[in-house]
Amino acid sequence: MMDGTHAIKRSRSRSPKVSQSKSSKKKKRSSSRCRSGSDSPARKHSTLAKYRAEVPDRRKKERRKKRRKRTVSTTSSSSSESSSSSSSSSSDDSGDSTCKSKRSSHRKKKNKKQIKRKKAKKNKKLKKKTSFKLECQDTKSTEKEVLPGPSVNPCKKESPEVSGPALTDEQKSRIQAMKPMTKEEWDAQQSVIRKVVDPETGRIRLIKGDGEVLEEIVSKDRHKEINKHATQKDGLEFQMHSGMF
């Protein structure tokens, strides 16, 4: 039995169709190898030419991509910078607005305080004026109550009444001296110049007003005698002081 099966297999494997197919495949492979061996340098040359032609195109494309990336990066950076600058400007504007609002509020508070102070000062002044007016009115009313009659000047003194005989010139002069005088009367009295004779020396003096001595009128002989007496007195005083006499 075993021998029969092996024989069948061998017969099947050695069938003419199978052997033809195998031979055709081998021929195709050998032909393809021959063609590839004969055509390999031409193909290699064409592939190198294609690669060399494609290299600059690829480089150009890569450069374009890099440029695009750069432009995109620059635009993104510029946009980020603009956004940052806008944010900083907005923050600055907000800070300025807050500072301005604070300053305005501070000024308003100051103005309110100043207005209040001015009003308080005015009220104080008005109160003082009203109180002073009331005090003046009160004093006037009290004076009227105390002095209902005619007003009496304390400076004007009544002349003393003398009963008996008539007054002498000395008494009259004393009474006049006791009376107050006006400025005009005083000037008139002081402008009067009188001549007075001294009985002891015999000099004539010009006296203005109450006692101002203007000039002494003396004769020549009397003037010489006065000078002699003056020199003698001066010499005696000098000797007394020096211890000579």
From Swiss-Prot:
Single biological process term from Gene Ontology: mRNA processing
Pfam family, one: SR-25
UniProt name for this protein: ADP-ribosylation factor-like protein 6-interacting protein 4
InterPro entries on file: Nucl_RNA-splicing_assoc_SR-25
Compositionally biased residues, Basic residues: 23-32, 60-71, 100-131
Location of region: Disordered: 1-171
Family, per entry: Belongs to the ARL6IP4 family.
Gene Ontology CC: nuclear speck; nucleolus
Subcellular location: Nucleus, Nucleolus; Nucleus speckle
Keywords, ordered alphabetically: mRNA processing, mRNA splicing, Nucleus
Biased composition (Low complexity): 72-98
Function summary: May be involved in modulating alternative pre-mRNA splicing.
Top-level taxon: Eukaryota
Species the sequence originates in: Xenopus laevis (African clawed frog)
Record field: compositional bias (Basic and acidic residues): 135-146
